[in-house]
Amino acid sequence: VRMKNTFRMLLAAMLLSLFALPGYSWQKSFPEKDYVAYLFTYFTGNSGDEEAVRYAVSMDGYTYWALNDNEPVIDSKVISSTGGVRDPHILRCEDGKTFYMVVTDMVSANGWSSNRAMVLLKSTDLVNWSHSVINIQKRYSGQEDLKRVWAPQTIYDPEVGKYMVYWSMLHGDGADVIYYAYANAEFTD
């Protein structure tokens, strides 16, 4: 028992000494950016033009102010197959100049299991967006029992050098499952 306690004390001391090395940091450093605010994308509700992308801005990441008088900044009827979009997620690309946004292509008045698509958007000025509707059920075989495609998000995968889109899908009576795919270089597919 005494040997075990001595070993544990020695092991604990060695582990603690690793964290106490002078001048050593376990944090990854990131290059400083001269960005001055945070942009938040959101939708406001479940009816009419509430299912549309809006912008808000924050200087501290906690308090946000709606832009454009809290009106949509992108016409949902133009970019979607259903006439509405929800769950916007925006990402500044690695080049620092391009923005990708993904949204759920859905009008909730049609039912919570009525959508089969997402929309991929690309912009360099946050005003003018190119868009591409990805209808999973129409594009890929074996999706006959697909009920919904929800809440896509995008991240950059540095190991692959591509942008990954991940989202939730529900088939039949099962549970929602998270799927992912790498977008093409144009962010259209």
Indicate where each model-derived feature is located.
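Beta-rich carbohydrate-recognition and catalytic domains
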Residues: 26-149, 155-189
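Bacterial N-terminal signal peptides
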Residues: 11-20
